[in-house]
């Protein structure tokens, strides 16, 4: 309770700072060349990871071109870890200038962030992929912009499709399970499909949207998860196909669920699964090394809505005016065609801007990996995720219950969803 009160007090103090009489900055103004300024950028990458190294290299290039601005890159160990450290920093008024946060955490941190429309040019904002930008607004104010963003896509082992004599890739859920049945080869230990709901129930959330369901009302005041039978029906259907040996169930193993399902896919024991496009480049190389042909396609029934995920960049309101302008300049630099395209090629994350898709490096990547275009085209169906500070507690309860339903497939899914919905409403009401 003391930690929460301290966090809220810090939020109020910072909001008061942002409500002063100082006029909004002109987003076209440059930081004065004779005024050195340092910006600190917390991120979710390991310093020695490909993405961490990329960010550091881009910062070095930026500083070489802007000698008055020092960019300090600090890896904070993942989305959950960075949230804990940001909360502690908020309580002690030691927040960094800017940070990457998972998009759903904007509901917790928006009081501490600046309105980016006051610092980024209209041209820069308009060039972001609008499907990815939907989660950057809170109460109509632009608080975050996309950086390392992803969506669930359908990964298939084309080699197994060919062996089963199947050409068409399923585009609806009805086709998905029908195709999974045809792909299943129990003699060879091959499952037609697999499922991992993810630790924050992200995959379940996306499947729910694609079925026309939802978790929370648009105004973030009411849990609607159990208002229809859609959520329970999804779980029940997966339980059925698991019991029939059509869907691979990683929840019955002791290992990490994603690692288990990934290993099954790489070993040719799994023909299809829903996963983040953010692992595309890595998985594609691994599958080639294993002698398999992999493709990435759109999520079944994508047009009904698909969850987006991963990181957005925010700037905190405790930053000085010079730091805010410098941060905006660095964000604009990250969103340049060259840098945005290079990041997609390196990581497999979605291209964050419209124009970077035409960059020569990304065009070459698409020529070599034509199925990745499906991930790009799917962005138009992005569905805004819950933006409430109670979301972490809610998704933890949901993910735990979903895992239980998979571990014990005779569990009544209707009762489980009803229980989670009731718990989630209490969490939402308590804030």
Question: Which residues fall in each region the model found?
Answer:
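Glycine-centered hinge/linker elements that transmit conformational signals in sensory
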Residues: 180-182, 221-252, 299
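Extracytoplasmic/periplasmic substrate-recognition and gating elements
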Residues: 60, 64-65, 164, 244-247, ...
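Extracytoplasmic "Venus flytrap"/periplasmic binding protein-like
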Residues: 61-128, 137, 159-167, 171, ...
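Short, well-ordered beta-strand elements
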Residues: 34-48, 69-74, 97-98, 143, ...
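Hinge/lid segment of periplasmic solute-binding proteins
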Residues: 77, 83, 101-153, 162, ...
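Short, polar/charged alpha-helical segment
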Residues: 47-70, 398, 417
